[in-house]
């Protein structure tokens, strides 16, 4: 390689390797327990038809959404009002982007702290094990914060289609947050007001076929830090959820045209823990690639995080009000520290194992063993 030249990063989309690279291999306790296509019907599918009615269907929809948020923290919505043509265009452009030659995608490489663009992503910066996915991400709200230099210029129409998609998803998210505000006995706009100037980040995930899917994850187990997330996924399957700390997992049944909705940590705290922050991950497979588009609705960095409603007999889940920026910093620091502790424990266990092997070989056999 010429002096000063840099190696092309490994891209799963163009890999023909039959063995998974070590950097993607998860510890046994993190590996998939349920296949990508063993679907569960436990996550409710809720029709939003009539949600704009003052009474009538809105009351019934509200009850279903609240029940889902108290149980799993995740549900699916249909009849949501997002135009099918917008969904089709967004999905088409996403697939076209990941089909581009590596050099076209890498022009928007976001490594080195760049905000937005393309990356082969680990769940957490500094974590040793990578997730088996490629992503392209951009920040769409507030509008003044859009940096179009970090938005792909291929395929054509990316900007116009993604702007329309972002706009309609913002409307849907605010509508759902209105239902949750009312469920807490607050004004319809209470949660969106608590976000101050709501941020929106769109992450387009592409999970290529994987040579050894039983050894890795497309996206490591986590909860989202923000208020609410809306996920559009194809029909392949791979999104999984748990509500018992990872002991058992279910694979969410893909529903054509539906959005999977899950609450994040911020939404969980605003409800004083009443609504669950969904614990989820993504698994991959060796048969076909998978596409999903996650739209994260987050509060402004300076928004205050504290329960909006505390029911009688409850205590606040937070000791004191903090900003979302501080909440996010603490979450990332905690996750990174846990990753470091686990990595250190793994190294120490390996050293103990190697030492035991050496001692076993060096230990002289007794006379009884020799004559046995």
Curated annotation (Swiss-Prot):
One of its GO terms (biological process) is flavonoid biosynthetic process. Pathway: Flavonoid metabolism. Fe cation binds at residues 222, 224, 280. 2-oxoglutarate binds at residue 290. Its cofactor is L-ascorbate; Fe(2+). Keywords: Dioxygenase, Flavonoid biosynthesis, Iron, Metal-binding, Oxidoreductase, Vitamin C. InterPro entries: DIOX_N, IPNS-like_FE2OG_OXY, IPNS-like_sf, Oxoglu/Fe-dep_dioxygenase_dom, Plant_2OG-oxidoreductases. Catalyzes the 3-beta-hydroxylation of (2S)-flavanones to 2R,3R-dihydroflavonols, which are intermediates in the biosynthesis of flavonols, anthocyanidins, catechins and proanthocyanidins in plants. Can act on naringenin to produce dihydrokaempferol, and on eriodictyol to produced dihydroquercetin. This is Flavanone 3-dioxygenase F3H1.
